[in-house]
Amino acid sequence: MSTPRIVVGVSGGVDSSVAAWKLAQQGEPIAGLFMQNWADDGSGDCRAEDDRRDAVAVCGVLGIPFHFRDFSGEYWSDVFEHFLAEYAAGRTPNPDVLCNREVKFKHFLDAAQALGAERIATGHYAQVAHRGGRWRLLRGADRGKDQSYFLHQLGQTQLAATLFPIGDLEKSTLRRIAQDAGLPTHAKKDSTGICFIGERDFREFLGRYLPARTGEIRDPQGQRIAEHPGVFYFTLGQREGLNIGGVRGRAAAPWYVVGKDVANNVLYVDQDRDSPLLQSRWLQSEQAHWVTGAPPARRFSCTAQTRYRQPDESCTVDVQDDGSVQVRFERPQRAVTPGQSLVLYDGEECLGGAVIAATDAPLERQLAGSSFSSEVVA
């Protein structure tokens, strides 16, 4: 068996299948590697075995070697324990960002290099370019599928060793390529959600690791409205799952989460979807990561996303002495959530990002006892 120059992360999905096919068409000596990142206990719907069989089948069609690596231990210690700690603290984490940084572009890269490969390739919708002496992370051509948001923690070492073969394709084109190439995954549905939860009820799953305490649901004036099953099951702006029935003297309208008092186990709700209590003009992050290794300037203007697939929002960024950033948006943002990722862009280039630590949303700021001042970036 010849040494592969490139190892492709084959997930058993259509995206990684076409990524491998494109490289094979170019005559590159490649191999496929399937990563198992969660030790499924049989009660979920991760479908890891089905995905593995599909990955084996794709490698067979392409005539390339197949490899398997179990990273479930690394995933548990590097991703899942952080996921639980964030929820326990009342924040809403994004495990996909951490999985990319710690597993797919660290442990997977190490495994590929151990096989003798120079580079790895994945089926992410993103692009890499080398400009001005630095590697740049760019959005995928299909803006509806772009995954640069989840890749913003990558750096120069990872990007120098990474290929995104499908980054220049639209999803519809990719499906046609897969069908024409006879790839067995051409009609396979895209995976959704977090693998380790699968199709399970989120509360049931999280409750296995974080025992919940019931508590009060209150309106912004502090009046008791209902009872919740656990404050960390909910995130800002959420409507589903509150199970608030008819409340005497209140309109028959939906309720939305506008605040979480983790210390006192109280959830605050309002019937205004765009409640002023959910609006933020400023945010404070934890330490930021820059794709090129440094920010463009100490203060600069760019666009930002505070949630995946959110429209770009214009903002001003101030880099602090401790490496964190403070961000001022041109217009108020709804339900900016601590624990989620702030990702910054200059046109098509992803500059980097950080975890959101605090905002100036009135109720959340009061509950957190935040000293964050919007005057810093005004």
UniProtKB/Swiss-Prot annotation:
- Which annotated residues bind ATP? G9, V10, S11, G12, G13, V14, D15, S16, M35, G123
Q: Which residues form the active site?
A: C99 (nucleophile), C195 (cysteine persulfide intermediate)
Q: What is its EC number?
A: 2.8.1.13
Keywords tagged on the record = ATP-binding, Cytoplasm, Disulfide bond, Nucleotide-binding, RNA-binding, Transferase, tRNA processing, tRNA-binding
**Which family is it part of?**
Belongs to the MnmA/TRMU family.
Q: What class of enzyme is it?
A: transferase
By its UniProt entry, which HAMAP family does this protein fall under?
Answer: tRNA_thiouridyl_MnmA
Its Gene Ontology cellular component terms are: cytoplasm
Q: Where is this region: Interaction with tRNA?
A: 145-147, 307-308
Q: What does this protein do?
A: Catalyzes the 2-thiolation of uridine at the wobble position (U34) of tRNA, leading to the formation of s(2)U34.
Protein name listed in UniProt? tRNA-specific 2-thiouridylase MnmA
Q: Which GO terms describe its molecular function?
A: ATP binding; tRNA binding; tRNA-uridine 2-sulfurtransferase activity
